[in-house]
């Protein structure tokens, strides 16, 4: 896999608000239409307690890292066939890297 750009927090925040916020939170352990993204780095797919995952997400068994998220965010339905996530993906590498940077920074903050 090619090197992942470092990403820009502010640009990632904008991508998150436009593309992710409707279904996901990053600043709490609550779930919405999608599972919380708080603590996603290092977590195994399909393991947020209380969230009703698809069988595909539960059985994928991927550990979310910068690399796996970068690949997943390109085309979620291709990466996990059968996922319930309706998001089509982010084709631009910089946008994916920016979003990952934003998630990393937000997840490093203690919960309120």
Curated annotation (Swiss-Prot):
Cellular component GO terms held in the UniProt record: mitochondrial intermembrane space
Localization, UniProt: Mitochondrion intermembrane space
The secretion signal range is none
Q: Which Pfam families match?
A: Cytochrom_C (PF00034)
GO function terms (MF aspect): electron transfer activity; heme binding; metal ion binding
Q: How is it modified after translation?
A: Binds 1 heme c group covalently per subunit.
What are the binding positions for heme c in this chain?
A: 20, 23-24, 85
Q: Which UniProt keywords apply?
A: Electron transport, Heme, Iron, Metal-binding, Mitochondrion, Respiratory chain, Transport
Family designation:
Belongs to the cytochrome c family.
Q: What does this chain do?
A: Electron carrier protein. The oxidized form of the cytochrome c heme group can accept an electron from the heme group of the cytochrome c1 subunit of cytochrome reductase. Cytochrome c then transfers this electron to the cytochrome oxidase complex, the final protein carrier in the mitochondrial electron-transport chain.
Q: Which PANTHER family match?
A: CYTOCHROME C
Q: What is this protein called?
A: Cytochrome c 2.1
> What is the source species?
Caenorhabditis briggsae
Name the gene behind this protein: cyc-2.1
């Amino acid at each position: 896999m090619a090197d992942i750009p470092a990403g820009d927090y502010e640009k990632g925040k904008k991508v998150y608000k436009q593309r992710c916020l409707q279904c996901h939170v990053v600043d709490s352990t609550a779930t919405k239409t999608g599972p919380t993204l708080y603590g996603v780095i290092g977590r195994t797919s399909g393991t947020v307690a209380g969230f009703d995952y698809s069988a595909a997400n539960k059985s994928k068994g991927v550990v979310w890292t910068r690399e796996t998220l970068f690949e997943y965010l390109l085309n979620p339905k291709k990466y996990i066939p059968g996922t319930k996530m309706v998001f089509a993906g982010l084709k631009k590498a910089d946008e994916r890297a920016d979003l990952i940077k934003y998630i990393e920074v937000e997840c490093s903050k203690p919960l309120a």
